[in-house]
A protein has these predicted regions:
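Positively charged n-region of N-terminal signal peptides that target proteins for export
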Residues: 1-4
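C-terminal motif of bacterial Sec signal peptides marking the signal peptidase cleavage site
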Residues: 17-20
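Bacterial signal peptide processing site
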Residues: 22-24
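Short glycine-rich, low-complexity/disordered patches
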Residues: 28-30, 34, 38, 42-68, ...
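Exposed beta-strand-loop-beta-strand "reactive/processing" segments of non-cytosolic proteins
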Residues: 52-88, 159-200, 204-205
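Contiguous hydrophobic, core-forming segments of folded domains
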Residues: 75-111
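Long, charged/polar, surface-exposed segments that mediate recognition or autoinhibition
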Residues: 102-153
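Conserved small/polar residues in nucleotide/adenosyl-binding loops
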Residues: 222-224
């Protein structure tokens, strides 16, 4: 996920040379706010023709790490011809309002059967439920650690990858969600190595369970 954020952030900065990358948070709703989640719903409603497209992946994220500013919405979807594409929407910062061209979806997946994809819609995003998930995850933060940001939120329908081995044991049509949360250890946010200082934080991944509760899955130490 960190590599994806860096790639998208770089493209945003290149596309807006007159502005500083440090201004990506201009007018940005906070990732953990109802406003941010509702903006995702409204962006999908406004920009996607659900008669012609079925979305199988929705991801929204911050760009500047630890700032907690909603910046980008990324979708992957299939058209009636079975061709898969991705598209990026810039929701805040200097590139606010930019919509990327359709890009062919990468990976092994080349085509999908449009009729067999159920499709994610704005109704797949429940603002109240997601707020409760964030609250539950924050309650799991250990003592002496501080919440900094929601890194990203992903909703994904399980679709064929194009590789039988990778697709074994998958339940096609199943919808899963997960999100990452960034936290810092109090008093240990800045570390120094070889005379260079860097920010140290932990990226914690949470899976959303079928009953709507969350489960901590993975913790990664990151330096920036």
């Amino acid at each position: 996920m960190k590599k994806l954020i860096l790639a998208i952030t770089a493209s945003l900065c290149i596309a807006t040379l007159i502005s500083s990358c440090n201004n990506l948070g201009i007018n940005a709703p906070k990732m953990d706010s109802d406003e941010a989640t509702q903006l995702i719903v409204e962006t999908l409603e406004k920009n996607i023709n659900f008669d012609e497209w079925k979305i199988y992946e929705i991801r929204w994220m911050e760009a500047d790490e630890l700032e907690n500013n909603l910046t980008v919405l990324f979708v992957e979807m299939v058209n009636k011809a079975g061709d898969c594409f991705s598209q990026t929407f810039t929701l805040s910062g200097p590139g606010k309002g930019n919509i990327s061209d359709l890009d062919e979806a990468g990976g092994l997946r080349g085509k999908l059967d449009f009729e067999k994809v159920k499709g994610l819609t704005p109704a797949s995003i429940n603002v109240e439920a997601i707020r409760k998930q964030y609250e539950e995850a924050k309650a799991m933060i250990p003592e002496n650690y501080t919440f900094k940001s929601i890194g990203d939120y992903l909703i994904q329908e399980t679709v064929p990858s194009g590789n039988e081995f990778l697709d074994r044991n998958k339940t096609f049509g199943e919808v899963k969600a997960e999100f990452s949360m960034n936290i810092t250890e109090n008093g240990k946010e800045i570390v120094e190595s070889a005379g260079k200082k860097s920010v140290q934080y932990y990226e914690v991944t949470f899976n959303v369970l079928p009953d709507g509760s969350v489960q901590m899955e993975e913790l990664s130490l990151i330096h920036i």
